[in-house]
Amino acid sequence: MKKIKWLSGQPKVTSGVTWGMPWKKGELKKGDRLALMNENAETRYVQSEPSAYWPDGSIKWTKHAAVFGGQENQSFTVHKREVPQPTESLSILETEHDIQVDTGALVCTIHKTGSDFIQSLQINGKPIAAGGRLVAIRETRKESAAKMVLLHERSVSFIKRAAIEQSGPVKAVVKIEGVHVLHKTYEEWLPFVIRLTFYAGLSEIGLVHTQLIDRSGKLEFVKGLGIEFDLFLEGEPYNRHFRFAGEKGMYKEPAQLFGTRKFNERYPLYEKQINGEMLSPDEEHKEWFAHGTQNAVWDDVKIVQDSSDHYSLSKRTGKDYAWVGMLHGSRAKGLCYAGGKNGGVALGLRYFFEKYPSALEITGLAGSRPKMTIWLWPPDGEAMDLRHYTGNTHVASAYEGFDEMRSDPTGIANTNEISLACFSHMPSDEVLNALADKWQAPPLIVCEPDVYYESKALGVWSIIDTSHPLKKELEEQLDAAFLFYKKEVEQRRWYGFWHYGDVMHTYDPIRHMWRYDLGGYAWQNNELVPTLWLWQAFFRSGREDIFRMAEAMTRHTSETDSFHLGEYAGLGSRHNVVHWGCGCKEARISMAGLHKFYYYLTGDDRTGDLLTEVKDADYALVKTDPMRAFYEKGKHPTHARTGPDWAAFCSNWLAEWERTENSEYLKKIETGINCLKRLPLRLLSGPTFEYDPATSMLHHMGDGIAGGYHMIIAFGAPQVWMELAELLDDWEWEDMLSEFGEFYTLSDEEKRKKSGGALHDGHFHWPMFAAGMTAYAARKKQDPHLAAKAWNLLLEDKLSHTPLPIKPERIETWTQLEELPWVTTNTVSQWCLNVIAALELIGDSLPAKKETSGKKG
């Protein structure tokens, strides 16, 4: 039996939910049936499948789908038992040309080719919508001294492949892949991937849309990017209605307003019209109708979120007439509705203000075929600019990676979550508002922290324990670190289509500003793995705010900081002013271990794609050698450091092995480990090797050579390797990890002696980064002296680079700010990860209480 609960309260409206949960080794076998039980001991069907396996073949992670009514129970349990039949099932039928999904409340027919992915949407046997064509507007520029000419060309989607990925009975998923095609030249550009998700009994569709960039962005600019739906609405203009979700509720109007000079807001039917009641002319009100039908018909209406703090609503009577401003607001909830006598459609875009600019538009509302467009990048503002910020690399002055200019967006992606709901009647404001809230923060079922911890399915980390005074102090500091970044996202407005989810690298206390404009000090791009810190913080706490930040960071870093096609496919881009700007393209940024927990917790299929994408990322190093600035090509195809390169490969291979049980990826891990075992210094060798992806072999070049020993451990290698140690049953591998952790803390003299003179203090920078590995060594050796060294690395300010307490200062500059003058995301991420590990491994060896409540950090 497993206890599960809602991440943030039960949904207010009926919702389809997919979630994941871990299992102890041997606890769940293939073929075991699972059922869901609520607090009233009522059992229901849950669609279940494995998403990862233990080495013995038992199930490590499962993925589940179920439909929950509004005001559901707060908690549930999952049991191993015979599964009851689902009360509602969907059906799916595939033909040569289309795929039809019938949820019982909605019938959706999906094209397998052409421009529109939805052939029809039907409610109660009647069509309500169709289309679903993707729209991209290309901008090209011709500039002279006297003028600039902008050319805007419209392109629409062309479907290349549509396939059923899940077929029920509770949940169905259809994956669609294609490109945009320009009208005039038929040129293809901007590949896309869309998944449509359906749940039994629901008249909703979830869309996960991924836009890939296949151009450099130097000559062609994306002016607009959206998805357009056709509506089949019935009724007169005065019975056509729109709704937009503002900050608190719905703004609503009809296409033709019946407030007139003679019959104003005091007229009793006027309020009914505004509230969406259908009007029928009769003898009593015929004069009102006669006046009202002479009013302007407002055919087009849109809401544009042009910054994280401003949206505007406007309307016009047609494309040949001016837009009239309606209202302004701060942060819209990203939902619009258009409907008539026969019902209508609601569309929603998640992260509507966070990933500005964004827009929702209704055109031709009063006509025979209205359109609704969800703009991921609205054409109202500036075109998307993917160019680099400079013509130089600024390596020496600004911490850029290489002298080579490799700032290229080709291969990056951006994924967005869109929702669509169909109605056979006018929905109430309460229903639409509940939908808007649900679509912005989708309901999710999670486990209690002790379930994650006891499963041992997530590597090495500690459960929260405040029984010891210093443990309590450290938990307060871990919480303070997270809260600082949570507030900083809002304070610094780290929002935007290409930015949301990321944080900045290093702070400038003189300008009271992050180094947003200084080469490698700007966006973090997963450097020193803050994503791992956030996921471990969530597993320990179960907190929604931590989950949401980890989710946003995972979505951003896995898509925008990584490359999915082109020369750098499988790699990611190091920290820079522009997310794809650094000359370093590295496996450490895109490694599976940074993203797999989101996949396991949510069952997100797009993230599953990304884990598969990187399984053979080591081959990308043949074209982009990470050590090309230091070494010429040798006998073997490329070079790799044990960390971060080979450690990232291990992470990728582990994810592929546990997800698919493909033992070839286990062999790749074992091959590298065995290469290291044969060397006198084992894991301390190198750290740079010649590498052959065809054999997965590391070829020794020497010890203490270029590569940097702190680089081995700063990018998630300890977390990956300790997780592997739990799985491999290889005592020598465990001993190698222990040896590395102990060696980092030795004196210079001891390092030279133990390595035969090859290694010394000059090779081992940033010892705090090794605190977790040192704690691992202390635990394995039962060595209190080593444990004391590890804690000293974390608690002594000069070594930890994290002055305690973490207590922001309030200052007055161009505005009032809270700041940590010393802060870098590198050190905070690593300090938190190493503290979390040390609390697990040597939590019983804590020193006397350290005072962290007086001085400012």
UniProtKB/Swiss-Prot annotation:
Coiled coil ranges (UniProt) are none
| Protein name (database record) | Uncharacterized protein YetA
Which superkingdom, per the lineage? Bacteria
UniProt cross-references to InterPro entries, sorted A to Z = PcRGLX/YetA-like, PcRGLX/YetA_2nd, PcRGLX/YetA_3rd, PcRGLX_1st
Q: What Pfam families does the record point to?
A: PcRGLX_1st, PcRGLX_2nd, PcRGLX_3rd
Q: What is the lineage of its organism?
A: Bacteria, Bacillati, Bacillota, Bacilli, Bacillales
The record lists the organism as Bacillus subtilis (strain 168)
